[in-house]
Amino acid sequence: MNNENSKFGFTAFAENWNGRLAMIGFSSALILELVSGQGVLHFFGIL
C-alpha cells in the first residue's frame, strides 16, 4: 500500500473514507433497528 501510483485505488485516503462510510452505514442500521424494533430489510419492506 506504499505505492501511491496504484491502479486500483487502494490508497490510504480511499481506505480511510471507505472505513468511515462503512461505520456510518453500520451505525445507521443499528440505530434504525433500535428505534423501529425491526431489521433494516423489514423496515424497507423487503422481507
UniProtKB/Swiss-Prot annotation:
A single Gene Ontology CC term: photosystem II
Segments crossing the lipid bilayer: 15-36
Top-rank taxon: Bacteria
Cytoplasmic compartment segments: 1-14
Residue spans, topological domain Lumenal, thylakoid: 37-47
The keyword Iron-sulfur belongs to this UniProt entry's keyword annotation: no
Span of the annotated motif Chlorophyll-binding motif: 15-20
Induction / repression: Transcription moderately up-regulated in the absence of photosystem I (PSI), probably a monocistronic operon. Expressed at very low levels during growth under normal light (40 umol photons/m(2)/s), induced under high light (500 umol photons/m(2)/s for 6 hours) with maximal expression by 3 hours and no change for 24 hours, after growth at 4 degrees Celsius for 6 hours and less induced after nitrogen or sulfur deprivation (at protein level). Upon return to normal light protein expression is stable for 3 hours, then decreases.
Gene3D superfamilies: Chlorophyll a/b binding protein domain (1.10.3460.10)
Gene null: resulting phenotype: No visible growth effect of the single mutant; double hliC-hliD deletions are out-competed by wild-type in high light (500 umol photons/m(2)/s). Quadruple hliA-hliB-hliC-hliD deletions die rapidly in high light but grow normally in normal light (40 umol photons/m(2)/s). Quadruple mutants are sensitive to norflurazon. In an hliC-PSI-less mutant phycobilin and protochlorophyllide levels are reduced. A single gene deletion red-shifts the chlorophyll/carotenoid ratio.
Record's keyword annotation contains Metal-binding: no
SUPFAM superfamilies: Chlorophyll a-b binding protein
Record's bilayer topology term: Single-pass membrane protein
One of the protein's GO biological processes: energy quenching
Subcellular location: Cellular thylakoid membrane
Keywords, alphabetical: Membrane, Photosynthesis, Photosystem II, Pigment, Stress response, Thylakoid, Transmembrane, Transmembrane helix
Subunit and partners: Forms heterodimers with both HliA and HliB; these are associated with photosystem II (PSII) assembly intermediates containing CP47 (psbB). In the absence of CP47 (psbB) and HliD, forms a homooligomer in vivo that binds 2 chlorophyll a and 1 beta-carotenoid per monomer. Cofractionates in an approximately 50 kDa fraction the thylakoid membrane with HliD. Associated in vivo with monomeric PSII.
Function summary: Forms a number of heteromers involved in photosystem II (PSII) assembly and/or repair under high light stress. Required for binding of chlorophyll and carotenoids by the Ycf39-Hlip complex. The Ycf39-Hlip complex binds D1 at an early stage of PSII assembly along with Ycf48, ribosomes and ChlG, the last enzyme in chlorophyll biosynthesis; it may be involved in chlorophyll reuse and delivery to D1 in the initial stages of PSII assembly. HliA-HliC and HliB-HliC heterodimers bind chlorophyll and carotenoids in a 1:0.6 ratio. The Hlips might regulate tetrapyrrole biosynthesis, maybe at the level of aminolevulinic acid synthesis and probably stabilize PSII assembly intermediates.
Family: Belongs to the Hlip family.
Name of this chain's protein: High light-inducible protein HliC
Organism: Synechocystis sp. (strain ATCC 27184 / PCC 6803 / Kazusa)
